[in-house]
Swiss-Prot record:
GO terms for molecular function: 4 iron, 4 sulfur cluster binding; aspartic acid methylthiotransferase activity; metal ion binding; protein methylthiotransferase activity. The lineage of its organism: Bacteria, Pseudomonadati, Pseudomonadota, Alphaproteobacteria, Rhodospirillales. CDD domains: Radical_SAM (cd01335). Residues 133-371 form the Radical SAM core domain. This is Ribosomal protein uS12 methylthiotransferase RimO. [4Fe-4S] cluster 1 binds at C15, C51, C80. The gene is rimO. The keyword Ribonucleoprotein does not apply. Belongs to the methylthiotransferase family. RimO subfamily. It is found in: Cytoplasm. Its cofactor is [4Fe-4S] cluster. It comes from Paramagnetospirillum magneticum (strain ATCC 700264 / AMB-1) (Magnetospirillum magneticum). Pfam families: Radical_SAM, TRAM_2, UPF0004.
Length: 448
């Protein structure tokens, strides 16, 4: 009787960058003959890819490790919290191995030790685009690791190291393989997307027979040749971001920018060790919208940062009203083990954080309501994410998966995930839209 391939399960916690790490680990293991299990009891060993950014995330990671141990018994730990092996083994001494973020080979070797592969590697087991944990029609494209910033509330540089960009040809080759495999949307991610290529001194590499610089503008322009949706995340407002907006106006990449502004008060931004000229940023936002009227701006903010006064918070609300951001997320400040901000004076009370968070999100909701109402009666392009007996759910060019709004098409049951359609918007509420399909679009075609 032939033996069955060993099976590996994975629990992936945290951000989209960690999800890409999980995909790369699974791709390596699949190439060596391992099968992937979607359940604890079906796996011979379970990998837990942890998050270690916030204290609450560390607690969630420890809880997930404990659950995996209870349900399976054989657990390998990796990811951002993996750098603190002492804390992990103190809570869970029976884990098989612990490694830090993007240490793919260490994880593979730990799996080998727990349950060896049955045969030599066979790359034919893996599709050219690798294995992905997202739906088939979209994928994350990680262009760099690490970060060179020194924000006082963050320990990412300590966890993931300094900026390490991938050569442009490497990124574009992966993107091309994904597009050829049927991916309709690529979400470009990193810790600091605008800094892409700085560590490489923007060196050129060859793609499609021509040189392409490791620079965000050049990369975005080249990605636009694939003919699919290209969405930029984690874009810091460096001056050269102005060069990206015309590409959006031309339709090469989606008119969408995810920029983590974090705050607007100069005092708070200085304490955060972030750029503090938000008045200048307002001027740039106006200029961007003049160049690309359809531009969607998403951002995240932190309220209750140590030393944040009521005046600072009011400044943030005023700036938000002027900026008229389309999509907004907000976090209540919490300590991060090892971050300088932990030791700052004038920590804000939890009830004050909660009250400010509610006020901020209400202000953001009112802006979203007004901007959403302006879309009623218009026609927008939508990518389909889900279809069931009640209808279809998709996203517009203004909506990224998981974090933004959705477009609901009641009664549209003959669509499939990944389809592109034109929807006439009938109603809007908060970040969501409702409407009817008026046209089906053909599959995208690469631009050669």
């Amino acid at each position: 009787m032939s033996q069955t391939n060993p099976k590996v399960g994975i629990v992936s916690l945290g951000c989209s960058k960690a999800l890409v790490d999980s995909e790369r680990i699974l791709t390596k293991l699949r190439a060596e003959g391992y099968d992937i299990s979607g359940s604890y009891d079906g796996a011979d060993v379970v990998i837990v890819n942890t998050c270690g950014f916030l204290d609450s995330a560390r607690a969630e990671s420890l809880e997930a490790i404990g659950e995996a141990l209870a349900e399976n018994g054989k657990v390998i730990v990796t990811g951002c919290m993996g750098g603190d092996e002492k804390a992990i083994r103190s809570a869970h001494p029976s884990v098989l191995a612990v490694s830090g973020p993007h240490q793919y080979q260490a994880v593979v070797e730990a799996v080998h030790a727990a349950i060896p592969p049955l045969h030599d590697p066979k790359l034919s087991l893996v599709p050219p685009e690798g294995l992905h944990l997202t739906p088939h029609h979209y994928a994350y494209l990680k262009i760099s690791e690490g970060c060179n910033n020194s924000c006082s509330f963050c320990i990412i540089p300590d966890i993931r190291g300094p900026l390490m960009s991938r050569p442009a040809a490497d990124v574009l080759g992966e993107a091309e393989r994904l597009a050829e495999a049927g991916v309709r949307e690529l979400l470009v991610i990193s810790q600091d997307t605008s800094a892409y290529g700085l560590d490489l001194r923007h060196a050129e590499s060859t793609w499609r027979g021509r040189p392409v610089r490791a620079h965000l503008t050049d990369l975005a322009s080249a990605l636009g040749e694939l003919g699919i949706w290209i969405r930029l995340h984690y874009v810091y407002p460096y001056p050269h971001v102005d060069e990206i907006i015309p590409l959006m106006a031309e339709g090469k990449i989606l008119p969408y920018l995810d920029i983590p502004f974090q705050h607007a008060s100069p005092n708070v931004l200085k304490a955060m060790r972030r750029p503090a000229n938000q008045e200048k940023v307002l001027g740039r936002i106006r200029s961007w919208r003049e160049t690309c009227p359809d531009l969607t701006l998403r951002s995240t903010f932190i309220v209750g940062f140590p030393g944040e006064t009521e005046e600072d918070f009011d400044s943030l609300l005023g700036w938000l009203e002027e900026a008229q951001l389309d999509r907004v997320g907000c976090f209540k400040y919490e300590d991060v083990k090892g971050a300088p901000a932990n030791a700052f004076a004038d920590q804000v009370d939890e009830d004050v954080k909660e009250e400010r968070h509610q006020r901020f999100m209400e202000a953001a909701r009112q802006i979203a309501d007004e901007r959403g109402a302006a879309k009623e009666g218009t026609r927008i392009e939508v990518i389909i994410d889900e279809v069931d007996e009640e209808g279809a759910i998709g996203r517009s060019k203004a909506d990224s998966p998981e974090v933004d709004g959705a477009v609901f098409m009641n009664g549209e049951t003959d669509l499939e995930p990944g389809d592109l359609v034109i929807v006439e918007v009938e109603a809007a509420e908060d970040y969501d839209l409702w409407g009817d399909v008026v046209e089906r679009l053909p599959p995208p075609r690469p631009r050669r």
